[in-house]
Amino acid sequence: MPSSIQGTPVPRLLLAAPSSGSGKTTVVCALLQALKDRGLSSAAFKSGPDYIDPMFHRRVLDTPSYNLDLFLFGRHEPGAAAARETLLRHGAAADVAILEGAMGYYDGVGTGSEASAYELAAATDTPVVLVVDGRGAGLSLAAVLQGMAAFRVDSHVVGFIINRIKPMVYEHFKGAWEKASGLKALGCFPDMPGCTFSSRHLGLVTADEITDLQGKMAALAAQAEKTIAIDELLACARQAAPLTGSGSPAFHPHPGRAVLAIARDEAFCFYYEDSLQVLQQAGADLVFFSPLHDGELPPCDGLYLGGGYPELYAQALSQNASMRASLRRALDARLPCIAECGGFMYLHQAFRDSQDRLWPWVGAVPGETFMTSSLKRFGYVTLKAEKDNLFCCAGDTVTAHEFHYSDSTDNGHDFTAYKAGSQRHWPCIMANDHFIGGYPHIHFLGKRDWAARFVAACIHRKEGTHEN
C-alpha cells in the first residue's frame, strides 16, 4: 500500500453505547458473522486498549482485529493521524469496516472525552450507531438516544440498535423513539442467554475459553439477520466520507534480521497485532512458543512476554520446570527481552495465589507477585525513563496503559508513570540495556523507534556485538 492515500473510500461504522455492559461485543460479533455468512469481507477494529474484544472479532473473521487508540498512538493529532492510517491500511480492501467502541461513547481520559470512542469517530469521520440496553424501558429510551446524539454538535450518531429487548416491544416503540430522537432505528436484538459471553476480573473471558463459540456465533448471526436492518447498516456505512491519510511516519529499521520469540498460549495472549507488525517491519522474524506446553525457549535472538492470565495457570507454569529453567538461562545470558504485565509477573521468583500458596516461577527478576481484590494503577499513563535502557534514553516518554488486579513486591523504579488526568505518579518498570519489564503496556505504533531499537539489540546480539 502506498505511504500516502488520498480520498480512499472505506465504508465503515462505529458501534458505541451509553455505558459498558450494553452488549456491544455481542452485537458486533453477530453482525460480523452475519456479514461473513453473506460473503462480504469485514475489517474489525476496537476503540481503546482492550485486548479481549479483538480476540472475539478474530475468531469470527479468521483474520486479525486491530486497536484504534488515540492515547497509545501518541495523543492529539499524532494519535488521530495514526488512527486514520491504521483504518486505511486494514480497512481499504474490505467491503465494510466495523469499529467497536469502548466504555460509554463519550468516556475518555479523566472526566473528559480525550481518547474516547466519540473522539475516534471524530478523528476518522465515522458514522456511529448506538447499541442501547432496552431492558425494562419504554419511551424513556428516547431521552437516552436524544441526549447521546445531541451531547456534542458533531456527535456522528446516525442511528440505534436496541439490545436485550423483545422484537414486539421494539416494534411498538420504534416510531416513537425515531420521532423523539431524530435517529434511524436500525433493529433490535433479543436477550439470548445461551449465547452470552462470561466475564472475569479483566473483562470477558477470552474467545478460546468459550465452549462451542462457533455454534454461538452462528446463532447470533441468524438472529441478526432476523431483527437487525443489516442492509440499512451497510447503506449508512457507505455514506462515510472517503478517508485521507498523510502517510506513516518515517521509519528506519536496522538492515539485518533477528528471530524474536513471542509467548502465545492460554496464559499469555495480550498482544496488539499492529505492534507485532511494527516489530516485523523493524527486522524481527516472529516465532511463537508456549510457556505452558513447550519444554524450552526456541532458538531466538530476543524475547517478548506479553500479558494475559498467568495467575489462572500458576500451577501449570510452575510445574513446567524445564521452560522456567530455559528462560532463566536465556535472561541470565542477557537475551534482549520485553516483559509486559503478565509476562513481567511470570519472570518473578514466585506467585502467591488467593489461597496463599506460593508457586515458583522463572526467578529472573526479584520479588513475588500476588492477586489483590481491586484494580491496581488502572488507566492511561505517560511513562518517563529515568535512565538509559533497551528502549530509549533517560528523559524520553511514551504513552501507555495499566489494567491489572495483581501486584508485585518490586515493581521497579527505572521509569516514572504519570497518571493521565490526575496528579498521581509512581515509580515502575525494571530496565537496563537488555531488559525492560513492568506492568504498563505500550503500543509500538505510538513509538516505532522503540521497536526499532529493541530489534536492533536483538540483531546486534545475533551478530555478536553489544550496541544499542
What are these regions (language model features)?
Residues 5-26, 32-124, 132-159, 168-171:
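ATP-dependent carboxylate-amine ligase catalytic core
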Residues 8-11, 253-259:
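A short, charged/proline- and glycine-enriched loop
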Residues 14, 98-100, 129-131, 161, ...:
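Structural motif
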Residues 126, 183, 332-336:
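A short helix->loop->beta-strand "cap" motif at the edges of active sites that frequently abuts
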Residues 138-252:
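Internal gly/pro-rich beta-alpha loop/helix module
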Residues 258-321, 325-330:
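Phosphate-binding active sites in nucleotide-utilizing proteins
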Residues 286, 310-389:
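Cysteine-nucleophile active-site neighborhood
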